[in-house]
């Protein structure tokens, strides 16, 4: 088993993962309920941050933006004027540019889906690069890091670098939101299955995911670098991740004059709390429509006595079958309890936080970025903060047969 440990290892891995979040491939995905719920959860915390903004001319910094999966969420806010996406994976940024150009075209044609906004993309390791030096004349109203913050806790040095970027790039009345695994939840599950936490070779798993601690870890200590190996079917394969001890998180916030405004110990609480905007809650069932159809087919197989681990269990759960299901046949998803336990075990691994400046009045402000006519982006527009040059010819060859668009390459 090859374990991915460095940012470049992880970048190489994500380069090979196809666009499971787009189009028909997603409808046939085993982890569709997880993807749909996580998308709703991200939208909910993004709207929470948005509601704290006094201005309606918002700038966004998306750290570890990947393939730009959250671009549409920000577009739907209707008030974003500038978006900056940063990621260590060049191939993901190419996909993000394609997605942005498509969204810009849609918004120019129909403003009811939001207003057009300018986007820039930067190739950088957000866990080490001093991004505030690159964006030295810019501060952002909303800063996000979705499902990636745990990589920053590999060491005190990487965590310091990350939180330094957040502190220096967040506007005085801005907010930072992150979703990441919950250490307490992981330890509680290990204890419930009778594991000796002082030993190595600890494992949590079901048919969809696994968490493995190959070496003994001092879980009681709030030490950096508490490594485990995470695998999620169709999404993340045998990747080294790091537990985030909330004592460390709070200490890092304190050192950078930041304060936790909201903490949601697991994502399920987003549906229950009054802190999440009602608009987001009302959209939950709509965003889970595909999952409702998927669960309908899945339950048919389970009711026949089949198990999710059976070789032929997934044979009839494909895009064509899902498309054929009439909405009158299905039960709307209004509560997470309607999902099978395998999916809930994964969803309940994660928590969310919203962080703000402790003393906003002491934070130096910057002028807003104003771009009258947003323009499409190309691969050549990517700002490269790594030591490796970008070879456009090689990129074209690697994407051959998958994507060739003048709006991206020319």
Regions found by a protein language model. Name each.
Residues 173-181:
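Conserved beta-strand signature within the Rossmann-like core of class I S-adenosyl-L-methionine
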Residues 69-128:
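Class I SAM-dependent methyltransferase SAM/SAH-binding core
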